[in-house]
Amino acid sequence: MNILFSRFSFLLLFLCSWTSFTFTTTEAYDALDPYGNITIKWDIMSWTGDGYVAVVTIFNFQQYRHIEAPGWQLGWSWMKKEVIWSMVGGQATEQGDCSKFKGNIPHCCKKTPAIVDLLPGTPYNQQISNCCRGGVISAWAQDPATAISSFQISVGQSGTTNTTVRAPRNITLKAPGPGYTCGPAKLVKPSRFISADKRRKTQSLLTWNITCTYSQFLARKTPTCCVSLSAFYNETIVPCPTCSCGCQNSSQAGTCVDPKIASVVPALGKNNLEPLLQCTQHMCPIRVHWHVKTSYKEYWRVKVAITNFNYNMNYSQWNLVVQHPNFDNLTKLFSFNYKPLNPYLNINDTAMLWGIKFYNDFLSQAGPVGNVQSELLFQKNPLEFTFEKGWAFPRRIYFNGDNCVMPPPDSYPWLPNASPNIATSPFVILLITFLSVLILM
């Protein structure tokens, strides 16, 4: 028996070790956006007396995950004793110790510089293309034109040839907080550029590519949004699960505000990364409510409402990703933009929704105007449409790329027992008839 127990323990230990080795909780693969990533392209455009001039471009190839205010911050470590002489379209957050330089003082002398985008309204002589939006980068599916950010950097003490120059290492990307893991810089084919008149092509002298992937677990240890449900055929409103994103009785006191005294909450600064939440049973910054509103003969209607419970954060260019099998029959969408993502090729069950520019693309902080809403009209497909067993509710919802906590399926609003839509077996009908006869006798 002892030998058998020892062998079993060894086998269990081996399986656990193999599992922990093979899978990690920080895995960045996203089934809805399998090829999504942020690619940083470092193009050396010319050589200088002691270094080079490069254009660094950040491409957000993620379909529905964007970088919101206060924007991205890009960092790295120099391989040698490089310095940044000057920058256009961006700036280092710290200059560092430049005391050994006389005359021209570098823009940054730190071994590990951190670069941020410039703000809108920057003078034109300090701008380049795709800069100066405060570090905000749109999702690729939402607005490809603004899913790019660039800056120009003049590097010294770095080498002046392809063989003497060294790529930066330990690249980090904050957007604006943690969540992204960046790989090493890889030498790739030089980038090619087309002149304004489209009659001439040029190319970089040398190009490095850095790929960064996102993990929600690395970004936040707890969820950031939850989903509540309701339907016209049931009086029950299913709330977000209790403690979806945290609990009020946590060890951190003062982390939420009673909505009755919300009017006296001091403004702690726009887009403060530290949340100040309204006290709720779910304690999530964002709640998405899905309400099955109406059923017509050939159509059915849903109302979607997004509510912000964070007094320290507003959301510009927000987006919502919803999985539901009836999106293939979406007929009309009111006051939101829509784009199918189709992660499974011909199966259209995933939709990306976002606000209309200058109308409702800005979700204000918690308060009377801290919500946006829309209605969706679906056509009924006789082969699959039903209100039974929670079919009318979404399978998954993402807000700004983060997976929201759904209520358990057994709590969904069900059809009332007397509904004609509930299929009744012949056995049940026969049993009811038999009991009725017995009562009459």
Curated annotation (Swiss-Prot):
Chain residues carrying a lipid of type GPI-anchor amidated asparagine: 417
Propeptide: 418-441
Tissue and organ distribution: Expressed in roots, stems, leaves, flowers and siliques.
Gene Ontology CC terms, in alphabetical order: Golgi apparatus; Golgi medial cisterna; plasma membrane; side of membrane
GO biological process: cellulose microfibril organization; mucilage biosynthetic process involved in seed coat development; plant-type cell wall biogenesis; plant-type cell wall cellulose biosynthetic process; plant-type cell wall organization; seed coat development; seed development
Residues carrying sugar: 37, 162, 170, 209, 234, 249, 314, 329, 348
First and last residue of the signal peptide: 1-28
Family classification: Belongs to the COBRA family.
Cell compartment(s), UniProt: Cell membrane
Name recorded for this polypeptide: COBRA-like protein 2
Membrane-topology descriptor: Lipid-anchor; GPI-anchor
Highest classification ranks of the organism: Eukaryota, Viridiplantae, Streptophyta, Embryophyta, Tracheophyta
Keywords: Cell membrane, Glycoprotein, GPI-anchor, Lipoprotein, Membrane, Signal
Species of origin: Arabidopsis thaliana
